[in-house]
Amino acid sequence: MSIIRTVPSTRLINGQILETSEMAIISETEYKTNGEDCIIVRNVSESTVILDSKTTDHIVVKSMTRIIIKPDTGKIDEDYDEIVADKYSCIEFRFCSGNWYILSSDGLKNS
């Protein structure tokens, strides 16, 4: 289990300055986003990614394994408490007005 971070980045999220990284490669069974532009989830059989609205307002999630994506608050696309993404999926999320919205995706199944 590991987290590999790339280029350090300073971002302004919800009026707070956050020290984070542009990208993270995640090999954990559960991970909470931390302001990254992109995360890649790999080397685990399944993982749960929690979209943290306090530290993240926009993120791309690339899955190299099956993942469950949950918001810390609100819903995804105003309807879903969680979504399931199959291996090789790529999904772009934006937090707005208390919910997470899918801006772009491939490989999604009905959750």
Task: Please state what every model-predicted region is.
Residues 2-73, 95-111:
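Exposed extracellular interaction/assembly regions and N-terminal maturation sites
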Residues 1-2, 81-83:
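Parallel beta-helix/beta-solenoid repeats that form elongated, surface-exposed shafts/blades used
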